[in-house]
């Protein structure tokens, strides 16, 4: 492992889970009636998948690849310098900085995610992508508050089959 991966590595991460309960995925898969899919989006990790759901608010993608809606449409960002950086470099998305070993895959996956997602119900200039670790404004870092935030969502409920 490279140094910045050590803190995230879980050597016994599946300990206690029966092997027959683990399903290894090589590609994207549909779940249930097809209204939810796990889409392979290598980048954040080697086996990363994004959850895509057909909701009352359109197609929604949730992922660990980006940290804010600004990352998926930097040209609309109000964060100081972000829109200018995207324009100068031609960057369609802005990757987060914690997985440099897969930077190309992460960039491609973020473009894929925003292409799948419908428009955001919060601000239709942005895709309907909900980062699993969404950036939050913080007073110690002025000027870095996301332009728009997805916030929390609740859709349906889990039901255990009889």
Predicted regions and their residues:
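Histidine-centered catalytic micro-motifs
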Residues: 39-48
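Residues at the C-termini of beta-strands that transition into short coil/loop
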Residues: 26, 42, 64-66
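Cap/insert and terminal regions of metallo-dependent hydrolase folds
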Residues: 52, 56-162
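Metallo-beta-lactamase
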Residues: 1-40, 86-95, 99-108, 113, ...
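Well-ordered beta-strand positions
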Residues: 30, 42, 52-54
């Amino acid at each position: 492992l490279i140094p910045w991966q050590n803190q995230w590595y879980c050597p016994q991460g599946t300990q206690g889970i029966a092997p027959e309960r683990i399903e290894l995925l090589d590609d994207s898969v549909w779940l249930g009636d097809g209204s939810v899919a796990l889409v392979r989006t290598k980048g954040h990790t080697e086996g990363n998948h994004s959850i895509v759901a057909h909701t009352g608010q359109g197609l929604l993608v949730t992922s660990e690849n980006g940290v804010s809606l600004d990352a998926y449409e930097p040209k609309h960002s109000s964060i100081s310098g972000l829109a200018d950086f995207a324009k100068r470099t031609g960057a369609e998305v802005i990757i987060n900085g914690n997985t440099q070993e897969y930077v190309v895959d992460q960039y491609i996956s973020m473009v894929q995610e925003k292409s799948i997602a419908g428009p955001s119900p919060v601000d239709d200039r942005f895709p309907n992508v909900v980062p699993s670790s969404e950036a939050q404004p913080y007073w110690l870092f002025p000027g870095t508050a996301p332009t728009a935030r997805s916030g929390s969502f609740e859709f349906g409920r889990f039901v255990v089959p009889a």
